[in-house]
Each structure stands twice: as structure tokens, then as C-alpha cells.
Amino acid sequence: MAAKLPHKGNKFKSYLPRKTSKFKFSKVSELEVFLLLEGMDKTKSFGLDKIHPFLLQSSAIEIYQPLTFIINLSLKTGVFPESLKIAKVIPIFKQGCRLLCNNYRPISILSALSKIFEKCVLNQITFYFILEGLFTDNQYGFRRGRTTTDCLVDLIEEITVALDQGEYALSIFLDLSKAFDTVNHSILLTKLIYYGIEDMENQWFDSYLHKRKQRVLVNGIFSDLLMINSGVPQGSILGPFLFLIYINDIEQATKEFSLRLFADDTSLTLTDKNLDLLIEKANAAFNPIYEWLCANISFP
């Protein structure tokens, strides 16, 4: 879908809120890093660096202090380590013809050390977004205490109430193909500034996103390194949260609809007693959403 949308330049800025607060990195404590190392999932696989989570967990007491120093240095200088930006991609066959690439689901595996860096940052940025109330209440995805069930119950309740009142209900469901891959890095970094993440903090996210690479592993053989020019990092800790930030302002284009989001899965609902009028209203109200998609969802 992204490839079919005409990009609208800098129009995406018109949907963004005015900046009212500012985010600054806090110094990461040695205790936080130690607990993250201790809590690593030993069953997870390792990345291209071949450092297994079990090894990190087992050596937590020896490495937590130097690792804390490196993480804080990364935040202070706005530089994410290049060696942690290379992913190992394993294609998993789904169904159909094995000769078609679309019939495989890519599993991206990053360095286990990268997860420690990212969790430290995620803890801070999550607290900031919650404290400042920056996320739309219509987002149910990747948020503590919210589930797909909550989203579905809310939708069913609205439709039930409408039917009880003798109204028709119309819902439009959007499913963006490979949505996490359609994130434009330049647009995302600009959005972070609008949400108060600027200066060295924005530079860190710039470093985190850019110049990422991947190697595909098939039958024990690795491909050459391939550059990744768009999207949030697959298999990462910060990726889903960054996508929520990216899509957060879509509510500015859906004021006529009742909006519900679960990450990229979007439902838009309208009700009216007159069916013909309802369809007419829905067609007209969808135009601003199309404009938002044109302004935001694209490959660079």
C-alpha cells in the first residue's frame, strides 16, 4: 500500500501537536543494568556477535559496571554502537510455493547486548510519554494494561449501543501491509522533536535508526550485508514503541470517526439512523485519513 500512496512532502507536520514539554535522558544506574542482565531470557537466540543471553546473565556480576558506563556514554554522546545495529535474518516458511519470497516470514535477531541498551531507553521514554499524556487514548497496542480484548469489547459496545438506539453502524478496517517497514526515518525524527525529544536525545535516536544492516541466513550460509533504509528495527525493543509514536497523530485526521488502534491495525466507526447518509458521511470522512496516509506512510 505504501508504494501506491503519493507522498505529500512536509504536510505531515500539520497533524503534529505543539511541543509543551522536553525529554532528557537520565543517568542509567548500575542496579538497573544488573537487574536487566539477571532477568534476560536464556531461551532466546543470539545475534551475529554470537553472545548468548545465557552468557550475559551468568556473567552479570562481572560486566554490569563497565556495561553501565558504556550505556551512559552512548546516551551522553548521542551515539548508538554500530556493532549492535546488524541483524541476523532467518526466513521462516509459512505456506504456498517455497520459491516465492512472500511466502516466508523474516525473523530478525539482534544482539542480546542491544536489548539492554534499548530497555534502559524504553523505560525512560515510556515514563515520559505516560507522565505527559502524549499517547492517544485510542491506542491499545503495546501498552501496559491494554489488550486486543479491551479494544474489541469497546468496539462491540459502541455498535451494540447504536443498534439499540435504532442506528446503523459502519466500520472501516485498515491493515497496512508491512507497516513497521514503512516508517520514514526523517519523519519519525521530526515527530520526536514535536514530542519534546530533541538535541542530544534526538541525535541518539538518529544514530539508533540510521545505517542499520542485516544478513540473511539460509541453510547455514549468510548473505552479504544489506543496508536498511526505512522502518523501525525488526526484533528490537524500541521498534514497537517508536511505531506508536509515528502513528499517534493519525487521530487528528479521524475526528468524524470513532477511532481504535492496535499498533498498525486501525478501526474507524460511524453511526447514523439514515443508512444512505451514513455511507455518504463515511466516504467524505475518509478523505482526511487518506491525506494523512499520503503524508506519513512512504519509503524514503
Which stretches of residues belong to each language-model region?
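Catalytic palm subdomain of template-directed nucleic-acid polymerases
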Residues: 179-195, 267-290
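Polymerase palm active-site segment centered on the conserved acidic dipeptide of motif C
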Residues: 197-203, 258-261, 275-300
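Active-site palm subdomain of RNA-directed nucleic acid polymerases
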Residues: 121-139, 240-270
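Surface-exposed loop/turn segments and immediately adjacent short secondary-structure elements
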Residues: 1-102, 108, 112, 116, ...
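Conserved polymerase palm-domain catalytic core
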Residues: 176-261
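Catalytic palm active-site di-aspartate
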Residues: 86-89, 105, 139, 169-179, ...
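Conserved catalytic palm subdomain of right-hand nucleotidyl-transferase polymerases, strongest
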Residues: 42-51, 100-109, 150-190
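Inter-domain linker/hinge segments that demarcate the starts of reverse transcriptase
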Residues: 30-38, 66-73, 123-125, 151-162, ...
